[in-house]
């Protein structure tokens, strides 16, 4: 449990880079569409290369698993990654990095409250500690948030709240369907791959709606892919594996 908690805290640290870089890309004129899509466009080849270098038959194992239940993988990968990161990027466009980071912590409570969907009772002790953490975060940010208009808060908070629910939901549903031999790295790669139809459609829409991304946004997206798409996601999913 202590290792899982430490991994979760470390994942939050890496996620913080995402909020800062997303806000920076927005202030630089970049669209949330490309902030979202480029992260996964870059994350996929990075994870592919890691699995290839690692050997141990990981790529073949995850491809066989996806072929065994393709619709399950497509659906829950879209929920866990598509409906997580697209709304998160949209919310980051309307809110400061501190507001996005604080609101994102709702995912701690959301993960606990989703427990009955997987045939288990809500662990009240974990829920209690999660609520303490969440309340503490919002108390620290309340005075600054009070200075914002309701419209600004709603535009930032609603997409982030959706993301905070979809992220643990998609992850834990696929944990149910994956056999034990599928590692965390393999599952993250599989979800990234199977969410690609969503990102390709969103990217095609983005070309027509906002044009192509700038070179600066592309470069910053590589950083997001490394910090959030690889490091934070692997740590978060590994921590979830440890406590399931």
Predicted regions and their residues:
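Transmembrane alpha-helices of multi-pass small-molecule transport proteins
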Residues: 28-83, 110-114, 132, 165-170, ...
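Hydrophobic transmembrane alpha-helices of multi-pass small-molecule transport proteins
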Residues: 47, 125-144
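Hydrophobic alpha-helical transmembrane segments in multi-pass integral membrane proteins
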Residues: 83-89, 137-149, 195-210
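Specific transmembrane alpha-helical segments of multi-pass solute transporters/efflux pumps
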Residues: 14, 19, 52-104, 139, ...
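A helix-boundary/kink motif common to multi-pass secondary transporters
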Residues: 30-32, 96, 123, 182-183, ...
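Specific alpha-helical transmembrane segments that line the substrate/conduction pathway
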Residues: 34-41, 88-121
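Glycine-/small-residue-enriched transmembrane alpha-helix faces in small-molecule transporters
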Residues: 1-38, 78, 90, 135, ...
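Helix-helix packing/entry segments at the starts of transmembrane helices
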Residues: 11-12, 38, 99-106, 173-196, ...
């Amino acid at each position: 449990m202590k290792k899982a908690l430490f991994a979760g805290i470390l994942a939050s640290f890496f996620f913080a880079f995402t909020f800062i870089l997303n806000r920076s890309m927005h202030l630089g004129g970049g669209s949330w569409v490309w902030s979202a899509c480029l992260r996964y466009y870059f994350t996929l080849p990075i994870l592919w290369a890691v699995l290839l270098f690692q050997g141990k038959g990981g790529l073949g194992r995850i491809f066989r698993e996806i072929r065994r239940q393709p619709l399950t993988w497509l659906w829950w990968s879209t929920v866990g990654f598509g409906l997580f990161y697209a709304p998160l990027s949209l919310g980051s466009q309307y809110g400061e990095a501190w507001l996005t980071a604080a609101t994102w912590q709702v995912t701690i409570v959301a993960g606990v409250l989703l427990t009955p969907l997987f045939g288990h009772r809500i662990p009240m002790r974990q829920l209690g500690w999660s609520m303490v953490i969440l309340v503490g975060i919002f108390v620290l940010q309340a005075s600054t948030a009070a200075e914002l208009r309701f419209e600004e808060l709603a535009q930032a908070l609603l997409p982030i709240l959706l993301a905070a629910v979809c992220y643990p939901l998609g992850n834990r549903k696929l944990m149910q369907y994956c056999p034990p031999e599928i590692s965390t790295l393999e599952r993250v790669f599989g979800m990234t791959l199977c969410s690609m139809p969503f990102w390709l459609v969103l990217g095609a829409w983005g070309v027509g709606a906002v044009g192509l991304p700038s070179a600066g946004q592309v470069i910053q997206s590589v950083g997001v892919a490394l910090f959030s798409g690889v490091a934070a996601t692997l740590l978060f999913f590994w921590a979830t594996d440890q406590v399931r």
